Amino acid sequence: PIDFDLDRTQKTLESVKKNGIKFQVGFNRRFDTNFQSLESRILKGEIGDLHILRITSRDPAPPPISYIEVSGGIFLDMMIHDFDMARYLVKNEVVQVYAAGGVMIDKAIGEAGDIDTAIVTLKFANGVLGTIDNSRQAVYGYDQRIEVFGSNGMIRAENVETDTCILSNAKGSHQPPLPHFFLDRYKSSYLTEMVKFLHCIENDTIPEVVGNDGLKAIQIALAAKESYLMNRPIEIKHTM
């Protein structure tokens, strides 16, 4: 995130605006071709009115405890990308958050003040419902999937495997493994993100992911953290 604190984030964005700085928030997943296709087909109305959004985001292995201690926690460090993706796809603001989670992978993560497994339910202003699940450890690889369900159908963005070859033999069919690192999965999105930002600078245009997108994601993440600690839904008031 831009910062772990909303007030400091707001002041940062005010300074950026005051000084005329080109500013793009690093939500690289918006530049992933699969997720862009998902957004495009939603906007074309291929599945009608949106009803339910489901996002799965699971890392292959937890980061070092030294990182966990300064990360801001799973909602601000990891799930914040999914909060932004939810806004990107639904094109509406989250008004209610309910979070549940626990320490199921490594007790050292809990001792560092964080959790390693979480599920969040979102309610949007337009009535769309969303769920996001995060895990710090999926033993089978980097698991990144999205499903959007609507009045006229459903669209899924499945995992991107290391190649498209499937081995079939006497022991069955065997798919290639999933990427084991986020840079492997999202390499092209990082490149596209940088190219698009350079174009904004060269052509003096507005970046695709602006400061307010970062602010809104932080707001949702902080609400999720509060919900987890309080064990109740948290309402989000959009006054920023």
Label for each model-derived stretch:
Residues A108-D114, A125-T192, V210:
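NAD(P)-dinucleotide binding in Rossmann-like oxidoreductases
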Residues I52-I55, S189-K196:
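Generic alpha-helical secondary structure signal
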Residues L13-K22, Q36-L50, F149-G150:
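Basic phosphate/pyrophosphate-binding loop/patch that engages nucleotide-derived ligands
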Residues K22-Q24, R54, Y98, T131, ...:
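Structural detector of well-ordered beta-strand residues that form the stable sheet scaffold
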Residues I65-L129, S135-Y140, N212:
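Rossmann-like dinucleotide-binding domain that binds NAD(P)(H)
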Residues R8-L13, K18, A125, F197-M240:
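C-terminal helix-rich "cap/oligomerization" subdomain common to oxidoreductases
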Residues P1-R30, G45:
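Beta-strand-loop-alpha-helix segment that lines the small-molecule cofactor/substrate pocket
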Residues T9, F35, D82-F83, L191-V195, ...:
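A general structural signal for well-ordered alpha-helical segments in protein cores
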